[in-house]
Amino acid sequence: MASHLGGLRDAPVVRVESLVRSFGPRTILDGLSLDIEKGEFVALLGRSGSGKSTLLRALADLDDKVSGSGRLETPDKKSVVFQDARLLPWKRVLENVVLGLDLPDAAERGRAALEEVGLNGRETAWPVELSGGEQQRVALARSLVRDPDLLLADEPFGALDALTRLRMHDLLRQLCARHQPAVLLVTHDVDEAVTLADRVLVLDKGAIAADIAIDIPKPRDHGHRRFGEIRSELLRHLGVETRPVLPV
């Protein structure tokens, strides 16, 4: 069961110790431990079936039907962004952003969040009128309007075209720098992980196989020598061997 951290200023926003999650006889997470600090951006890589989404669902309190054990502490204020923006098609954009937000200034907060993601003026649009990238901007606004201490993102840009993904990377980096939530991004994209994260984890057979700090200033240049070194190291942990590029 997850417990919730209450106001310990120096405590990590997320603390996981010896976490086990199983589906029937199959163990998905096997004694996993992890801390995430306030304002820290952590990316999680792993092959299909390694337990990435299971960990995210555990942190989001969405796995109550899964058997398991271990210590799991998360903040009360958390938001989740999925690959599918999950907007309600019968509600307009602003209504989607403030859905469930029971505050007297909810509409004002929602408009401010939409302005942050570059969608001011689209408050009354229907979701079907938006592009895929715009729908994900709405999903980000919906998450950030709640001022979360923890932002969980499960392949949020996986369905977007390459150019839109790059724009969303810049937007997410700026928003996280401004709001300072702890972030866990689940992704299959090694370059995306190295571009955005302060730290990249590789999950293998339900345990953390690698924990690599990204010691490159932001915004990051993919042509930076260190970027290539970290990419190669992560790919090796994922079972992909790379060869150095030979000079022409």
Curated annotation (Swiss-Prot):
Entries under Pfam families matching the protein: ABC_tran
Binding site for ATP: 46-53
Membrane topology: Peripheral membrane protein
GO cellular component: plasma membrane
SMART domains the record matches: AAA
Enzyme class, UniProt record, top EC level: translocase
MF (Gene Ontology): ATP binding; ATP hydrolysis activity
Subcellular location: Cell inner membrane
Catalytic activity reported: ATP + H2O + aliphatic sulfonate-[sulfonate-binding protein]Side 1 = ADP + phosphate + aliphatic sulfonateSide 2 + [sulfonate-binding protein]Side 1
Function: Part of the ABC transporter complex SsuABC involved in aliphatic sulfonates import. Responsible for energy coupling to the transport system.
Family classification: Belongs to the ABC transporter superfamily. Aliphatic sulfonates importer (TC 3.A.1.17.2) family.
Name of this protein: Aliphatic sulfonates import ATP-binding protein SsuB 2
Organism this protein belongs to: Mesorhizobium japonicum (strain LMG 29417 / CECT 9101 / MAFF 303099) (Mesorhizobium loti (strain MAFF 303099))
Organism ancestry: Bacteria, Pseudomonadati, Pseudomonadota, Alphaproteobacteria, Hyphomicrobiales
